[in-house]
């Protein structure tokens, strides 16, 4: 969606705009002047902007809306992060919000009776994860690692006849099958090798099932794959594609 799509034209009405950036699950990332415009047009007066940046450092280079705000205390910007992706610690189930002091105090009052809080053990664990030396290392190493994986798989997919539609963030590739083959066809072939992909129609908000315009698309996740398994993974996928296209 464009910035105009997000902001709309209801200037005198209160509104809160929600956005994941990089987008989950597409990996499309708003950056540069586009992100700057979004922050400037939607973070002040009657408008608020909540950006989920859980995948921030999966993108190379990392992108944050915080780069475009001069004084967060004079804004309605909310930036969310999580240990799940960037800090590679999904088990502790901890996230955070950066916002103005006033908005954080309001959220803190609500969480005390509405949410319950985070366990002491998770807080201690996260405190160590956020040690500056470790976060500097994560911001350097993680984007490079996933970028290598992203580019390597994209190149291989193009060579075996898949069309890719992927952003620069996240650890997924969106691929389109040729010859009107469906993701359901591909999964049936992959199951024989103990593998699977996520069907595009399972991510269709219109919930059109087999009639979905996304039925020829699938999502391939390289996030949890051992880099050394690359050849085997491409071989399994190539055989499955050959099976459904014969």
Regions found by a protein language model. Name each.
Residues 18-21, 50-53, 81, 172-176, ...:
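Short beta-strand segments
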């Amino acid at each position: 969606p464009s910035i105009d799509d997000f902001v709309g034209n209801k200037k005198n009405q209160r509104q809160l705009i929600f956005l994941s950036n990089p987008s989950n699950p597409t990996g499309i990332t708003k950056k540069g002047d586009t992100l700057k415009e979004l922050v400037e047009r939607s973070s002040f007066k009657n408008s608020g902007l909540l950006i989920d940046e859980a995948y921030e450092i999966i993108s190379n280079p990392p992108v944050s809306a915080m780069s475009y705000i001069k004084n967060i205390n004079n804004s309605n910007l909310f930036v969310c992060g999580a240990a799940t992706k960037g800090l590679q610690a999904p088990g502790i189930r901890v996230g955070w919000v950066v916002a103005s002091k006033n908005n954080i105090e309001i959220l803190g009052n609500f969480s005390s009776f509405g949410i319950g809080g985070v366990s002491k053990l998770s807080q201690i664990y996260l405190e160590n994860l956020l040690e500056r030396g470790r976060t500097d290392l994560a911001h350097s190493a993680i984007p490079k690692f996933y970028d290598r994986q992203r580019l390597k798989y994209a190149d291989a997919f193009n060579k075996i006849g898949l069309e890719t539609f992927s952003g620069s963030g996240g650890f997924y590739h969106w691929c389109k099958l040729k010859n009107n083959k469906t993701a359901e066809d591909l999964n049936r072939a992959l199951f024989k090798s103990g593998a699977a992909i996520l069907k595009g129609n399972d991510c269709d908000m219109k919930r059109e099932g087999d009639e979905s315009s996304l039925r020829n698309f699938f999502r391939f996740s390289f996030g949890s794959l051992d880099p050394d398994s690359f050849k085997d993974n491409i071989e399994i996928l190539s055989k499955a594609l050959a099976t459904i296209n014969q």
